[in-house]
Amino acid sequence: MTARHPKLPHVYLKPGEFHFATKPTVVTTVLGSCVSVTMFDVFSRTAAICHALLPDGPRDDVFRYVDSSIIRMLEMFMSRGITPRQLQVKLFGGSDMLGATASRPGVGSRNVDIARQVLAAEGLEVAAADVGGTRGRKLFFYTHTGEVLLKRLNRTEADS
């Protein structure tokens, strides 16, 4: 899937990491119950993506948690004079792969819920999303266009 831009640098994003880009890059990550939020400013061609594991938690490891990841990403854009309303936001992941029920939602569902709540509280609309279900996802995020290519995985292929 990355053959479209074979000369661009590639980064593999692990759980609990993020990537902030001002230069064209292809960022790849694999999601199970984790979520990735992408943010892209079309004017400056600045982009960010996180791979958050849990809905919320202590602030010692910001990018492990959905809520603090989103806030920190926004702060990084705002520190460069980019306002939240300039951002195109996309949301991915949040599979419930380990037998969640309606009365006891899994961590994937909780990750998606928190992401949507924080984004709404910050006045951000989700332009595109592919969340939930029972299958993992592999993402290819093109930081110079904001485009995300997605491949759905069999349950055994997702590692988070």
Swiss-Prot record:
Transmembrane segments: none
GO biological process, one term: chemotaxis
InterPro entries: CheD-like_sf (IPR038592), Chemorcpt_Glu_NH3ase_CheD (IPR005659), Cytotoxic_necrot_fac-like_cat (IPR011324)
Annotated EC: 3.5.1.44
Pfam families from the UniProt entry: CheD (PF03975)
Enzymatic reactions: L-glutaminyl-[protein] + H2O = L-glutamyl-[protein] + NH4(+)
Gene3D superfamilies noted in UniProt: 3.30.1330.200
GO molecular function: protein-glutamine glutaminase activity
Keywords: Chemotaxis, Hydrolase
PANTHER family linked to this entry: CHEMORECEPTOR GLUTAMINE DEAMIDASE CHED-RELATED
Record family assignment: Belongs to the CheD family.
Known function: Probably deamidates glutamine residues to glutamate on methyl-accepting chemotaxis receptors (MCPs), playing an important role in chemotaxis.
Designated name of the protein: Probable chemoreceptor glutamine deamidase CheD 2
